[in-house]
């Protein structure tokens, strides 16, 4: 996993409530197993007019001024539904580094974190202000200080300290385990003989 300390980027508002994982990444794309390439299918039914990938010009992610936005502002209950990790893969592959919503589906929240995306919960009034920013206005998310720095001020956010440690140090579950490699080896060496090969 890549280290996440601060991120500065532009925002795109998609303020719908209850955007579920099936909307984020429809089931027909779940047979793919490589984490790369899913960005093309993110919000497929909303982004495209047909199966030939004709852009829906009215959909915000297809509007030129929002190309390259890396911070998604959304409504309540983002990522509800099934536990498909592919939805987080699609968000990451599209280029989103931060999702700011009113709440998250529990499993999707963890899937985002496991894939290096920082999910942040903010009240509606903050999200509404963020949604009013122009497409060229940047905000900075500072994980160490747990602050969102915006043109209208700073907004604090909460994150579990274990997740914060993992993101700041670029560690996934395997990376955490490897930090204890010497202790694991010592334990294995000191096991009773009947537990050893």
Swiss-Prot record:
Keywords: Amino-acid biosynthesis, Branched-chain amino acid biosynthesis, Leucine biosynthesis, Lyase. GO terms for cellular component: 3-isopropylmalate dehydratase complex. One of its GO terms (biological process) is L-leucine biosynthetic process. It is an enzyme of class 4 (lyase). Catalyzes the isomerization between 2-isopropylmalate and 3-isopropylmalate, via the formation of 2-isopropylmaleate. Heterodimer of LeuC and LeuD. This is 3-isopropylmalate dehydratase small subunit. It comes from Streptococcus suis (strain 05ZYH33). The gene is leuD.
């Amino acid at each position: 996993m890549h280290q996440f300390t601060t991120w500065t980027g532009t925002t795109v508002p998609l303020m719908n409530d209850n955007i579920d994982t099936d909307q984020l990444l429809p089931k027909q794309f779940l047979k793919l197993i490589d984490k790369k390439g899913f960005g093309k299918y993110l919000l497929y039914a909303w982004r495209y007019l047909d199966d030939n990938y004709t852009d829906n010009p009215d959909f915000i992610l297809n509007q030129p001024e929002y190309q390259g936005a890396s911070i998604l502002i959304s409504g309540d209950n983002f990522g509800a539904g099934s536990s498909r990790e592919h939805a987080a893969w699609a968000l990451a592959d599209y280029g989103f580094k931060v999702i700011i919503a009113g709440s998250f589906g529990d499993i999707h929240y963890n899937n985002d974190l496991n894939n290096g995306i920082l999910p942040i919960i903010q009240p509606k009034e903050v999200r509404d202000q963020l949604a009013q920013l122009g497409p060229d206005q940047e905000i900075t998310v500072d994980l160490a200080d747990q602050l969102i720095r915006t043109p209208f001020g700073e907004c604090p956010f909460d994150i579990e300290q274990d997740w914060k440690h993992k993101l700041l140090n670029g560690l996934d579950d395997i990376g955490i385990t490897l930090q204890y490699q010497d202790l694991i080896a010592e334990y294995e060496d000191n096991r009773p003989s009947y537990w050893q090969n």
